A protein has these predicted regions:
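Short S/T/G/P-rich N-terminal loop/turn motif that feeds into the first structured element of a domain
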Residues: 1-47, 52-66, 80-101
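Short, conserved catalytic or adaptor-binding loops enriched in Gly and charged residues
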Residues: 75-79
Length: 101
C-alpha cells in the first residue's frame, strides 16, 4: 500500500470552501482505499489530507482523472500553500481493508 499525509494551507477565511472542493468528485478514484480531509484544530486555515492507495501508480493516475483535475483547478485560488508532507506504508487498521485479515 501507498500512503500520503499532507498539510495544506487555505487562503485566510477560505478553509470551508477549500475543504468542500477537495471532497467533491473524490468518491470514484480507482485504487483509493481511504481519502480523509480533516481540519487542523490549532490553525483555522490548515487542512490535513490523509490518503491510502493500493499502489503509488494508482495515486499518480488519479491526478489525471477529469473530476480530480476539475477539483484542482477550482481549489487552486483558495490554496495559500503547503506544509509537511509524508509518504507512508500503511499496514492496516480500523476501516482499512488490506486483504490480510
Amino acid at each position: 500500500m501507498y500512503g500520503l499525509i499532507g498539510k495544506m494551507m487555505a487562503v485566510s477565511g477560505q478553509r470551508d470552501a477549500l475543504t468542500a472542493i477537495l471532497l467533491e468528485g473524490t468518491s470514484d478514484m480507482p485504487g483509493c482505499l481511504s481519502y480523509i480531509i480533516a481540519e487542523d484544530t490549532t490553525d483555522a486555515n490548515a487542512i490535513w489530507i490523509t490518503e491510502v492507495w493500493d499502489t503509488e501508480a494508482n495515486h499518480k493516475a488519479s491526478l489525471g482523472l477529469p473530476a480530480v483535475q476539475a477539483a484542482i483547478a477550482k481549489a487552486r485560488p483558495l490554496i495559500a500553500g503547503f506544509g509537511e508532507r509524508f509518504i507512508t506504508t500503511p499496514l492496516g487498521g480500523v476501516g482499512l481493508l488490506t486483504g490480510k485479515q
